[in-house]
């Protein structure tokens, strides 16, 4: 069985790790970096760029370069968070036929899981290049506060990328695994994981206990905001720059897509620089132009200014911390360690706020960019059976229930219930002779069902006529270890049953996923063909260069017919290469013709080299012999009185 890899599929950056024995390896990608930007670019010729290459060209191709797609995964188009993003993103967010938020690129309609699958495929390839073998299984992390639709969509993304997702694991829980197994502290400890990433915020309170030599990680509570992260911090800086530039130059940059992309890049850099310095300068020449000519942007931003701009965002992370502490039934003073995860936690003001709330310095010995992928890799090792000393008890982040009479949300499973879990309850009909019931499943904490997230609905039909309140309908909820819900309804009188895995009326259908898997496989095949074509073209170019060089040196030693044959074959190959031909077989055939025609010249070159080496060796031998004679003669002239010693040959046994 191959290794199960751990993937942190992040909003801004992604990371992949594997376990090698008891040590973990965070794998560098083809560019040599341990994290990969979660950016995907769709090029005019159909090529798809992922990671750093996509990021590099984003300024010149903003409408077809997708980033922060994780903020759309598993979301409906009408959700206010999606509507907010529509105005901010340079790419086009559209409403899919099923009501989900999708993206339109180069006249193609793409689902967020399909786009995220490109990043997962890059992570898969990174691991395969390192291991030298195919990888088919993975543990993928999600924000702890992701709802059922978002978890299901992430699982779908894995499938489209050609991965069997063995487990969906919460990011803070993964970070706790990485921390808990790395440190050898004995006894029970309560830790708080504060995870502020590129697009999401989570906080989890986790108890790490030693139980008979086994480390047990029990999540006591979790809370968060799936639409709060580094992207929002960047946006505050961008808005500030736009405002200042408008005041100074009278030009509104918010309508200029190219300028916005440059501003985004600069805002991110400024934010990072201000974590280690007190002031930074944003310098963007030729940012735009008007009738009076080109405009240049030059602006100084201090750390104090940045902190003032984002203070409210940092403050928004504290309330979930309060709720998580309360839900866990612990006091702030009982928290032994505070772990910071996510790139945004490098910001000094964030660290200061966390220290202020928890009353202690956060740990500095956890890598905020890699801990989540490391934890996922550890869970992969547990699932493959190679590790027996770890037990992970995670929770469902939000309450689950059904809509009952009057639009009330009747909770079946409360938030922070340890998973996997099952719960069933008996309900009845609201009207006389009601022949069917519709079960509507919701997730959330509001009292009224309409205020929560509708996960899906289904019907139980064929209920025998009876007065209201008489039929007994048992509704069962079953949450698996991935946090994904399965619901069943059964008429106890007739035994009729209907069970579904909650696939919201949104989400991808099985047929759509199958199609995307096939498209992805076709893309991989196409990529392989393009790679082989590029290799053939490179081989052809190299052969043209080396043959021309050899002709310059040895052409006059060839018979006229032979030389013409080579020149004709060369011309043919060059023309094929210059025409941009995508016929690999034709290029290879022309390469073969040049190679065959050049055989005689190769033989002559080889013979000349042999002759030259022979001449050199002969010259060296003659020089050596002459030199020896001269020195011997000289010696005899100068030393006539020297007596020759007798010698005898000693034979070895």
From Swiss-Prot:
GO terms for molecular function: ATP binding; ATP-dependent protein folding chaperone; unfolded protein binding. Keywords: ATP-binding, Chaperone, Nucleotide-binding, Phosphoprotein, Stress response. The modification Phosphothreonine is found at residue 200. InterPro entries: ATPase_NBD (IPR043129), Chaperone_DnaK (IPR012725), Heat_shock_70_CS (IPR018181), HSP70_C_sf (IPR029048), HSP70_peptide-bd_sf (IPR029047), Hsp_70_fam (IPR013126). The keyword ATP-binding applies. Induction: By stress conditions e.g. heat shock. Gene3D superfamilies: 1.20.1270.10, 3.30.420.40, Actin, Chain A, domain 4, Substrate Binding Domain Of DNAk, Chain A, domain 1. Residues 615-653 are annotated as: Disordered. Pfam families: HSP70 (PF00012). PROSITE patterns: HSP70_1 (PS00297), HSP70_2 (PS00329), HSP70_3 (PS01036). Residues 623-632 have a biased composition (Gly residues). It comes from the Bacteria. Signal peptide: none annotated. Belongs to the heat shock protein 70 family. Acts as a chaperone. This is Chaperone protein DnaK. The lineage of its organism: Bacteria, Pseudomonadati, Pseudomonadota, Betaproteobacteria, Burkholderiales.
């Amino acid at each position: 069985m191959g290794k199960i890899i751990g993937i942190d599929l992040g909003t801004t950056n992604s990371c992949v790790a594997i376990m090698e024995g008891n040590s973990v390896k965070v794998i560098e990608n083809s560019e040599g970096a341990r994290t990969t930007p979660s950016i995907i670019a769709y090029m005019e010729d159909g090529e798809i760029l992922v990671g750093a290459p996509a990021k590099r060209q984003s300024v010149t191709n903003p409408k077809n370069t997708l980033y922060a797609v994780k903020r759309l995964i598993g979301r409906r188009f009408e959700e206010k968070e999606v509507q907010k993003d529509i105005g901010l993103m340079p790419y086009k967010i559209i409403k899919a036929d099923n009501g989900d938020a999708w993206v339109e690129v180069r006249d193609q309609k793409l689902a967020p899981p399909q786009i995220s699958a490109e990043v997962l495929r890059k992570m898969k390839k990174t691991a395969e290049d390192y291991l030298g073998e195919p990888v088919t299984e993975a543990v993928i992390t999600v924000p702890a506060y992701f709802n059922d639709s978002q978890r299901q969509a992430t699982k779908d993304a894995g499938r489209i990328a050609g991965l069997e997702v063995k487990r969906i694991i919460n990011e803070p829980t993964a970070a706790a695994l990485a921390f808990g197994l790395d440190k050898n502290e004995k006894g029970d400890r309560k830790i708080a994981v504060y995870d502020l990433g590129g697009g999401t915020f989570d906080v989890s309170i986790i108890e790490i206990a030693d139980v008979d030599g086994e480390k047990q990680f029990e999540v006591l509570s979790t809370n968060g905001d799936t639409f709060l992260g580094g992207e929002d911090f960047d946006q505050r800086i961008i808005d500030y720059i736009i405002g200042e530039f408008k005041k100074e130059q009278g030009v509104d940059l918010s309508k200029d897509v190219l300028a916005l992309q440059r501003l985004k890049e600069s805002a991110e850099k400024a934010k990072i620089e201000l974590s280690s310095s007190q002031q930074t300068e944003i310098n963007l020449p030729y940012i735009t132009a008007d009738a009076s000519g080109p405009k240049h942007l030059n602006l100084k931003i201090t750390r104090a200014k940045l902190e003032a701009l984002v203070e409210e965002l940092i403050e928004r992370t504290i309330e979930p911390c309060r709720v998580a502490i309360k839900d866990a039934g612990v006091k702030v003073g009982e928290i032994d360690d505070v772990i910071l995860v996510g790139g945004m936690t490098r910001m000094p003001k964030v660290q200061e706020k966390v220290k202020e709330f928890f009353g202690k310095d956060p740990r500095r010995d956890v890598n905020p960019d890699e801990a989540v992928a490391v934890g996922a890799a550890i869970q992969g090792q547990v699932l493959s059976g190679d590790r027996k000393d770890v037990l992970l008890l995670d929770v469902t982040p939000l309450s689950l229930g059904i809509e009952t009479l009057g639009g009330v949300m009747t909770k079946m499973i409360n938030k922070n219930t340890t998973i996997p879990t099952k719960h069933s309850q008996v309900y009845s009909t609201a009207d006389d002779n009601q022949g069917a019931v519709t079960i509507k499943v919701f997730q959330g904490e509001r009292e009224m069902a309409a205020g929560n997230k509708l996960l899906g609905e289904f019907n139980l039909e064929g209920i025998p006529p009876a007065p209201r309140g008489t039929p007994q309908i048992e509704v069962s909820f079953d949450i698996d270890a991935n946090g994904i819900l399965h619901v069943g309804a059964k008429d106890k009188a007739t035994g009729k049953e209907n069970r579904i895995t909650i696939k919201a009326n949104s989400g991808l259908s099985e047929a759509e996923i199958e199609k995307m898997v096939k498209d992805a496989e076709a893309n991989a095949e196409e990529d392989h063909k393009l790679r082989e074509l590029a290799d053939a073209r490179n081989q052809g170019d190299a052969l043209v260069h080396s043959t021309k060089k050899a002709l310059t040196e040895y052409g006059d030693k060839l018979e006229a017919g032979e030389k013409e044959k080579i020149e004709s074959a060369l011309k043919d190959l060059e023309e094929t290469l210059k025409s941009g031909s995508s016929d690999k077989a034709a290029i290879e055939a022309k390469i073969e013709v040049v190679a065959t025609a050049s055989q005689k010249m190769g033989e002559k070159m080889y013979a000349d080299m042999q002759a030259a080496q022979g001449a050199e060796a002969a010259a060296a031998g003659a020089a050596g012999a002459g030199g020896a004679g001269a020195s011997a003669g000289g010696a005899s002239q100068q030393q006539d009185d020297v007596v020759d010693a007798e010698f005898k040959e000693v034979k070895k046994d």
